[in-house]
Curated annotation (Swiss-Prot):
High-level lineage: Eukaryota, Metazoa, Chordata, Craniata, Vertebrata
Residues binding ATP: 15
InterPro entries (UniProt xref): Ig-like_dom, Ig-like_dom_sf, Ig-like_fold, Ig_I-set, Ig_sub, Ig_sub2, Kinase-like_dom_sf, Prot_kinase_dom
Gene: MYLK
Catalytic-site annotation from UniProt: 107
UniProt name for this protein: Myosin light chain kinase, smooth muscle
Region Disordered, annotated ranges: 289-309
Length: 438
């Protein structure tokens, strides 16, 4: 929503949330707390926030230039490697600042890189709904992200770190210079399998016109071992980003592949094939915060009283735009789980999307036995209805039928799929690991 400040006429962006449960409110407050630490020219900023019963509003600066990749495919835009360097440098600067605050973004992707205006080359990073504080290095594990850009350690439910964001930067850079995606499959499961294998190359002719420095930059980010990736400071010191661009040859790069990539990504989004793997807060286009205490007392920055009128006046005006309460609906699956075939020792993931209101309770079953969460079985159920069962380190005993059951006061719904586990013979696979890169 576009919001107009009554006193000054200044235009802001409004991000509206419906938060019915304590967990939903806490997730949004966590985003607010994190955004309060992030004040940098390459990060979108927030000026205030309001909370009233089940409604929370964040007031943010407007970033009006559109998504970076949409800008690139515009007929009036000339894409060169020099432009790619400018954008990747800004992304690295923004993420470097985030990491220096002890925070990981965890959802870096093209949609979250916005152009400040429709003519310049300045960008800002947005959407910190999945960001987390990295308080105890090596101990944080997460089960969310966007399949095409998520790092292998997330899929395998292994400890994450600042380098988890660096993998995503590598994927973004690969696509930016070539218009090709290193890991996108025909569906989420195929994409996640591609990421887990961490196999990719520069064999396509698209890379014939890309410099060796650019390829080296990408190669040092798309490393499966989290310890071997460049950090942001090293990225900014890399010969590719540190090179003077004024005298660089402005050779045009083909945008044909990028247009095809964007068209395919839009098509997959329409079919819910490309989506976040369980978002913890439902995010709109922009995020950030630098406001005042909410009505519940969650800590934020002091409010400049001259910027906005009284909380009662402004919040009332903002909250009038919030949608009516949702009608009650019996549970149903808009996306059902599918049969999987995995190799012993790898991870398996069943994904579905559950609709219904009041929000259905969910139980997973292995054959006829209910599943309890453990290190082996992880259940991820998010407020937008996306629900996942992740099975780590799959063994032969996991070969079974799995059922997801959703129940609310109006009824119930189930969907079932089979997991087939391929057991490896002794000695199979030894010495057969593919090299991670050239």
């Amino acid at each position: 929503f576009r919001l107009v400040e009554k006193k000054t006429g200044k235009v802001w962006a409004g991000k509206f949330f419906k938060a019915y449960s304590a967990k939903e409110k806490e997730n949004i407050r966590q985003e607010i707390s994190i955004m309060n630490c992030l004040h940098h020219p390459k990060l979108v900023q927030c000026v205030d926030a309001f909370e009233e019963k089940a409604n929370i509003v964040m007031v943010l600066e407007i970033v009006s230039g559109g998504e970076l990749f949409e800008r690139i495919i515009d007929e009036d835009f000339e894409l060169t490697e020099r432009e790619c360097i400018k954008y990747m440098k800004q992304i690295s600067e923004g993420v470097e600042y985030i990491h220096k605050q002890g925070i990981v973004h965890l959802d870096l992707k093209p949609e979250n890189i916005m152009c400040v205006n429709k003519t310049g080359t300045r960008i800002k990073l947005i959407d910190f709904g999945l960001a987390r504080r990295l308080e105890n290095a090596g101990s944080l594990k997460v089960l969310f992200g966007t399949p095409e850009f998520v790092a292998p350690e997330v899929i395998n439910y292994e400890p994450i770190g600042y380098a988890t964001d660096m993998w995503s930067i590598g994927v973004i850079c690969y696509i930016l210079v070539s218009g090709l995606s290193p890991f996108m499959g025909d569906n989420d499961n195929e994409t996640l399998a591609n990421v887990t294998s961490a196999t990719w190359d520069f064999d396509d002719e698209a890379f014939d016109e890309i410099s060796d420095d650019a390829k080296d930059f990408i190669s040092n980010l798309l490393k499966k071992d989290i310890k071997n990736r460049l950090n942001c400071t090293q990225c900014l010191q890399h010969p590719w980003l540190x090179x003077x661009t004024k005298n660089m040859e402005a050779k045009k790069l083909s945008k044909h592949r990028m247009k095809k990539y964007m068209a395919r990504r839009k098509w997959q989004k329409t079919g819910n094939a490309v989506r976040a793997i369980g978002r913890l807060s439902s995010m709109a286009m922009i995020s950030g915060l630098s406001g005042r205490k909410s009505s519940t007392g969650s800590p934020t920055s002091p409010l400049n009283a001259e910027k906005l009128e009284s909380e009662e006046d402004v919040s009332q005006a903002f909250l009038e735009a919030v949608a009516e309460e949702k009608p009650h609906v019996k549970p149903y699956f808009s996306k059902t789980i599918r049969d999987l075939e995995v190799v012993e020792g790898s991870a398996a993931r069943f994904d579905c999307k559950i609709e219904g209101y009041p929000d259905p309770e969910v139980v997973w079953f292995k054959d006829d036995q209910s599943i309890r969460e453990s290190r082996h079985f992880q259940i991820d159920y998010q407020e937008d209805g996306n629900c996942s069962l992740i099975i780590s380190d799959v063994c032969g005993d996991d070969d079974a039928k799995y059922t997801c059951k959703a129940v609310n006061s109006l009824g119930e719904a189930t969907c079932t799929a089979e997991l087939i586990v391929e057991t490896m013979e002794e000695g199979e696979g030894e010495g057969g690991e593919e090299e991670e890169e050239e």
